[in-house]
Every structure is written in C-alpha cells, then in structure tokens.
Amino acid sequence: MQRIHVVAAVVMALAVSTSAARAQGEHGRGRGRGHEGGPPPVTAEDQQRRIHEEQQRMTDYRRHLDDEVRNQQQREAELQAQRRQAQFRAQQEYAAQLARQQEQIRAERDYARESYITSPHIYRFRVGGVYRETNQYGADLLRQAINYGYREGYRAGEADRRDHWRFDYANSPAYLEATFGYSGSYLDQSDYSYYFREGFRRGYEDGYYNRLRYGSAANGGYSILANVLTGILQLTTIH
C-alpha cells in the first residue's frame, strides 16, 4: 500500500511539473508574439512624456479658445459691415460651437488613467513634409479633423455664394481658426488644424460651386468622401 502511495505521488509531481513547464513555455511564446506580432508596450518613461504633452496641449488650447471667443464679436461686426448675412449666420453658429468647446474642456482630467497614454503608436502621417507618429486615438482624430473641415468649409462656401461674395476660403473665419471639434487631446493643435484646413478647402469649393465633387450629403449635413479623406491623410502603418 505504501509503495502505491509513493508511485502515485511521483506521478502527480511529474504531471504538475510538466503542466507548469508547458504553461511557462506558452507564456514565454505569448510574450514573443506580443512583440513580434505587434508594437511593443509603451514604456513608463514614454507614458510620462505623453502625460506632459497632453497637459501642455490642454493648457495651450484653453488659452487659444479664450482668445478666439473674445475675438468672435469683432469678426461678426466685420461681416455685418460687409453685408454678408449668410456668412454672418454661419459665423454665429461656429462661434457658439467654440463656446461649447470652451465649456467642455474645463473639466479636470486624470491623464494617467486614459487609454491614449498606454496605446502604442501604430501609424505615421505627414504634416508639411515632416513625419509624425500616432496611435489609433490620434488617427481617428485626424479623420475627424478632415471631415469636420469639409463640413464647415461647405457651409462657408455656400454662405459666400448666397452673399454673392468672391471665392475666398483662406479668409473665412472658420478656416483661420481651424479647431472645430478639437479638444486639446491626442494631437498637437497645429496638426489638427492642418488637416481641418485640408478638408475645409475642398468643402468650401463644393459649397461655393453648389456641387458634391469631394463629399456627399445626408440627413441635412455634409461629409467628405472616404476615398478623398484617405487620399488627404495617407496614413501608413508602422512595421
């Protein structure tokens, strides 16, 4: 009987040892797949750098919005003096949205708990010949910038057409401000504005000439075509 117990104990020990070895091997292979099959995790140092960048972006954008909201009355007065009533109404709506954004970004944020901080960079994009890297959150925001730019551009172009004003997207208040939909997160404001203006220019052209070359209309709104957006953004995957 004692001999049977000893044999059973040995068999059990071997089974446990084999199971542990198998689990350790799978765990090791899993780690290897994590690095080989995808980007490495964001280091603690890079996480701290991102937190600092996000804090600085928010500070800068709050200051920018404070200045812009103060300047809206002057811009509206200029449009009224030029008798551009359609553009004046469009500018009022744009100013109201900026005021809402100003309220939204006043809330405090716990940056360390935000998924953006630990999400690896997987995309590369270009601004003025300079390459940048970003993660899924930044890529989604770039797409939003282009689409919002197109929508606001269409409205501005349509307003200038109705006012019988010259083709002049570069002096449209929304084009100059160019942060509609930005929240001080994921991207530098200048990068967001760059792509917002790319969408705006095309939307303005469609609105001014009363056509849909670069976008489509649905439910009373306008959005840029997917292939046009892809051509503007030209995101590449980081290998």
Model-derived segments and spans:
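Bacterial N-terminal signal peptides that target proteins for export
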Residues: 1-8
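Extracellular, intrinsically disordered low-complexity regions of secreted proteins
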Residues: 11-12, 61
